[in-house]
C-alpha cells in the first residue's frame, strides 16, 4: 500500500463522458444531404439520435425539445442549389426553448441568412457537407463538432477540471477510436500500417463499427450510385450493447437462437 505524495511523469485517463455527445442531424433529401449530415455527425464521435429530412414539422420540433440534444447539425442543399428547405428549418429551430449549439453546414448561399434567422442563438458556420451532388466534404464540420464538444459539453459535464490533471489531449471516445483505427491502418511516421480494416468496438450500451477503406468496387463494371463513402467511417448500433442495451441483442437474434 502506497500513501502520501506520489510524483507522476505523465497521467492518462479514459472515460465515456456521461453518455457521450447527443446530436440530431437535419438535411434535405434522405439519400443525399441528410445522409451526409449523419456521416459528419457519426465521424465526429456523436450519438445521432435521429436524422430529419425535408421540412421540419411541429411534431419534429416536439421530438427535438423532448430529446434535448447537445448539438444540432443543420444542412441542406448543394452550393447554389435548394435554399428554401434549410431556411425554413432554421426558422423552425429559432423557436427552440433552450440555446442548443447549431452547426450550419448547408448551401453556402443560404448559410448566413440561416444564422440571421437564428438570431442570438449559438451558431457556427461551416463549409457545406455536400457542396456538389454526391461529393462529401465532412471534415470541417467534424472538426467544429469536436471543438464544441470540448469547449461546451465537457465543461458543462464537470470534466474541465480533469483536463488539468491529465497529460495530453481530451477527445470523445468514438473520435479517439476512429483516430486509432486510422493509425493502425495507415501507420505513423516510419511505421507501416496494416492496410484496409474493419474494427468493432463492443460497449455496454452501443456497438460501434469502424471502416478504414477506399471502398472501391472489385468489379470494374460496377456503377456507383449515391454519395461517396468516406475513407474513414464510423457507424453505430445504438440499441445493441453488452450491458445496458443487452436487450437489443435478444430482440435481434431471438431468445431461442441466443440460448444455443
What do the PLM-derived regions correspond to, one by one?
Residues 1-196:
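Nucleotide/phosphate-binding catalytic cleft detector across ATP-hydrolyzing
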Residues 85, 115, 160-199, 207-260:
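Helical "lid/coupling" subdomains associated with nucleotide-phosphate turnover
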